[in-house]
Regions:
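Small/polar-residue-rich loop-to-helix segments that shape phosphate-bearing ligand pockets
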Residues: 102-145
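Long amphipathic alpha-helical segments
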Residues: 3-120
Length: 145
């Protein structure tokens, strides 16, 4: 596989650590490499709105925010309902109305679940499957030069 540049590495776009979601701050790059720390998924939507992440980053942040939502529900920090899970996805989809890829991807992710238990059990694996698909595309593009 072609090693992706900094701006395309998943851990540098968004990652979860110590109960927080960290989003790579594209506004500061290339002068500095820093992250914006997010405490709830609605802050992730605000970060996308304010340009913390750009290009394909909003989609990846939205996907990681769905895993983060699962984590917060497990920790009792968000209401344990399917409506909470779906509501986060809808709020993320709404922040960039012209980003139809983000909306379609989140809709496809949600359509796989009929209840909260399914979502909680499968969201992380499903998100990583989607990200692996992006990796394959980036690899093919990288081979083309």
């Amino acid at each position: 596989m072609v090693k992706p540049p900094y701006l395309l590495r998943h851990k540098d776009i968004a990652h979860i650590s110590a109960g927080k979601l960290y989003i790579g701050d594209r506004r500061a790059f290339p002068e500095t490499k820093r992250f914006v720390r997010i405490s709830d998924p609605y802050q992730a939507a605000d970060a996308i709105t304010h340009g913390v992440t750009q290009g394909g980053g909003p989609l990846e942040v939205a996907l990681m925010a769905m895993i983060f939502t699962r984590d917060l529900i497990r920790a009792g920090k968000l209401e344990r309902t399917f409506a909470t899970f779906v509501g986060v996805a809808r709020s993320l989809s709404a922040v960039r109305p012209t980003n139809t890829t983000m909306r379609r991807t989140l809709d496809r992710l949600l359509s796989a679940y009929t209840n909260l238990d399914e979502a909680m059990e499968r969201v992380e694996a499903d998100v990583h499957t989607i990200l692996a698909g992006f990796d394959r595309l980036y690899h093919r593009m990288g081979r083309l030069g």
